[in-house]
Amino acid sequence: MEGVLLFWKYRALFFLVLCSLVLCKVHLSQASPTSQQHNDAASLSKIYPRGSHWAVGHLMGKKSIEEYPYAYDEADRSSAAVFSEGDKPSDGYQQWKESLLNLLKMIEVNEYRNSKAMREASVYNKKFSGAEDNNLKEMLDYLYQMMNMKENTSS
């Protein structure tokens, strides 16, 4: 129940986050190739069977050991740490979580300020003066008399 209330309270924010995630997913996904693109790729592979020749010469023999994801120790192939200490994948999740919590706190503070200003400036909190109170009593008395007259004439 609390999750539903939280969702309803921040529905605009959740909608914004959902839309941005969908747009990011659509932007990063690959489009399916058309038949013309497929034919172009097939014809290029026939011309250059080993790939693009323009980048072959200057990259030959320049593989770096630091960039290779595996470390070799006595012919044992074990995975090396690809991420440094500060770049763990969970840190990205923690950063997103912290930023969303900060955003929610800012929205909450903003809503509190707006509601406080509305309560202070509200017409409903205004006390009636003596003249307005008398006018209200006169109006209610007149309405009561009209209702009594209507009941008397109908019977």
Curated annotation (Swiss-Prot):
Annotated positions of the Methionine amide modification: M60
Superkingdom of the organism of origin: Eukaryota
Propeptide intervals in chain numbering: 128-155
Cell compartment(s), UniProt: Secreted; Cytoplasmic vesicle, Secretory vesicle lumen
GO biological process, one term: positive regulation of phospholipase C-activating G protein-coupled receptor signaling pathway
MF annotations from Gene Ontology: neuropeptide hormone activity
Keywords, ordered alphabetically: Amidation, Cleavage on pair of basic residues, Cytoplasmic vesicle, Secreted, Signal
One Pfam family here: Bombesin
Signal peptide: 1-31
Cellular component per GO, a single term: secretory granule lumen
Tissues and organs where the protein is expressed, per its UniProt entry: Brain and stomach. In the stomach GRP was localized, at the base of the gastric pits, to occasional cells whose distribution and appearance were consistent with that of gut neuroendocrine cells.
Keyword Magnesium: no
Major place of residence: secreted
Family, per entry: Belongs to the bombesin/neuromedin-B/ranatensin family.
Stated role: Stimulates the release of gastrin and other gastrointestinal hormones.
Name of protein: Gastrin-releasing peptide
Gene: grp
